Amino acid sequence: MRCPHCGRETPPGAYCGFCGARLPQGEGGEVPPRHGGRMRAHAYAADPRESLFTPAVISTLFPHLPPRRATLARWVLLIGVLVALGVALGRYAPIAIVLGAVLLPILYLIYFVDVAVYEDEPVIVLALTFIAGAVLGAALSLGFYRVLIGQRGLSLSGGPSASYVVLNAVVLPLLGQLLMLVGPLALYFIRPRFNDILDGLVFGVASALGFAAAQSVVYAWQIISGPLQRGGGVFDWALPTLRVTLLTPLLYAGATGLICAAIWLRRDPHVRQRPRTLATALPFALLAAAVGQVAPSLLTDLIPGETRSFIWYLLAAAGLLFLARVGLHVGLLEKGAEAEGIATMVRCPTCQRLTPDLAFCAECGMALRASPKRGVRRVAPPETPPAAGPADAPPPVAPPESAGPEGGAQ
């Protein structure tokens, strides 16, 4: 049947195998109003069980995970956050921060091994994403620690000085964002075969999580250098711990993943026409990431308070994660519309049904390029018996010899 959105002939099903749009069912059928349209907001491309507007961290930052693994990752994240929060409520903030600092990186390493997408070159991918981000994050935090303490000490009597606010809320976040891009951009230039929008998102998220983890450990060490237990109410420790161990890594991951996805989409071979959607435009991604990095730090310095600071970081992290989710969704739709199909069938890891090996599952609409390497099982089409070659041909039959007068050989 012909897709009304991209105009290509697509196998019958609920979704177009090329552009992922919802197809009308039956002769003269119509698509439900909320399911129509090229944007396909009712079904997120990497996990059609969720809406595009679902606030889901796992399916946004770890798009290759199959459904069962994604559910397990959500439980691990929830339990880890609760454990870190429980430790923080006991006023052991450094321990809670270290526990929270390793939570998302552990999830990433599990994800990296489970999806097996980069099993050909795991060392270089890990080294230039997570490890490079961690080293640069630790270096930046240690390098600026004494400078910030000195600037802060000069203005204790009348609130933060202008120089401290500029350094802490503008220079440091923007410099950190640039450092988070170093590793992924190195991969971009030295490994051009990683040319998929999913590669860009995963590399950016990995670098950001490594950066945030190292930054959190340095912050915890700075607290350990003083008393381990400090005074104050419960929220004096709980909210800062959640901000440092959860919201800040998510903010970094959303910002860096958004930028890297836009960069990788520009050279994706499956997207011949450059996307015109704002969410996938590189200038917009850079501007959104810069605002998301600076705004919460600036508001925290200008309007202090632990609860207010938590709210600023929560809003910034949620906004950047949503933009990264929209950018990935639209990017997968854009590249799918240019994809070419082959004759094999695959088993979709989401709905477990056979579907043509195109850009999207014809049954549930999942972007098959977002499937783990082990998740999509290809089923070869029935093979026709090969033509008999010389080795397989039956032995030739000798022509009958002519007989003599008495039936003997001449």
Where are the regions a protein language model picked out?
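Hydrophobic alpha-helical segments at protein termini of multi-pass membrane proteins
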Residues: 1-410
